[in-house]
Amino acid sequence: MRVVHVIESTATGTLAVVCTIANRLAAEGHEVQVIYSARDETPQNLHALFHPDVVLLNLQMKGPSLASTLLGLRRKLIELRPDIVHLHSSFAGFLGRLSTLFCLPSTAFLYSPHCISFIRRDVGRMKRYCFAALELLACVKSCTYVGCSESECAAIQRYLGRPAVLIENAVDRTVTARRDWNSDRSHSKTMQRIVTVGGIRVQKNPRLFAEIASSFNQDGTEFVWIGDGDPDLKRMLEEAGVRVTGWLARTEVIDAVAQADIFLSTASWEGMPISVIEAMTLGTPVVASDCPGNIDTVRHGSTGAIYHSALEARMLLKRIMDDDVFRNALTRQAREEARDRFSEDRFFNNVALLYAAKLKGIRQRVPA
């Protein structure tokens, strides 16, 4: 089977998902290509993240000319003639479908938005419907939507009137192999470290992170933002006493989350956050905002804590710091659930079965 992944957002959770699928496919002997765009936050060691047999092809998708980008992507996909094209993130999903109109009839197309655009909470209803209109335009090309959470699938059905196949995200084996790290650490120390991971952008709500950080005594609590992004928002975080690390190598991110006392998500919207799943798997208790994606991942009071305001977040953080019984219960239940629900094997098996079903359906409709 020849599979091509198209990814414009080549960083963080979306990249982690593509790596997992591509590497497992390549290890099983399938032919895998990844067409990607490089961003400022794209890891410098990108090639090292993939199986040696995965072929990486650079194509900058946010160039000066949309027409030239569409034509370039069309030419590349026709040249590769894949059995499966899997599009990742909204922009790649839009380009990938429009660029292949009236070609590749024997290819099955799948599209994983990884947090579809009309889930956004920073825009009004009219703009969300504009996003939906663009999605409907791209739907001229037959393609299977793959949602990563119940919230995302529900949004696709609501705005587009189309079903989506639910395949929840997962973490790769480099994380699950180290899930006992955090349980061995002492949490009675004087300095508590609270971390988050991601780009410094509106979606991750750094203003809320700064507000929560400012409410704590900096002598006893350290807030860390692992990532980089908007300079003004970064400055605001630093003025609130937050340490911003910049982009780190994946192994360094895993180390930092594993050694943290609490993982704090302040996101305003998510698909299904890989960083939260990784924290759960590593045994770092999670305190997360009540946004789409987070509420699909964390079960309040069982596998983590969900808050509705900065004040409630502070109260939950303090309780986890002060109440070892509560903390240990959250950690234990989160790790147990993550081991099965968010396992790489479960995720890849679901993806592989979907690929096989869609390819079989295409071949039955299109004569060889």
Spans of model-derived segments:
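Aromatic "clamp/platform" in nucleotide-sugar-dependent glycosyltransferases that forms part
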Residues: S268
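N-terminal strand-loop element at the rim of the active site
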Residues: H5-A67, A155-Q157, L166, G229-P231
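Membrane-proximal helix-turn-helix segments that form the acceptor-binding/catalytic region
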Residues: R128-Y145
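A conserved mid-protein helix/loop that constitutes part of the nucleotide-sugar donor-binding site
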Residues: L15-T20, T196-S215, W225
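Short His-centered aromatic/hydrophobic patch
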Residues: L87-G93, P113
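Conserved acidic donor-binding segment of nucleotide-sugar-dependent glycosyltransferases
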Residues: H300-L311, R319-V325
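Nucleotide-activated donor-binding/catalytic signature segment of Leloir-type glycosyltransferases, i.e.
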Residues: K234-T251
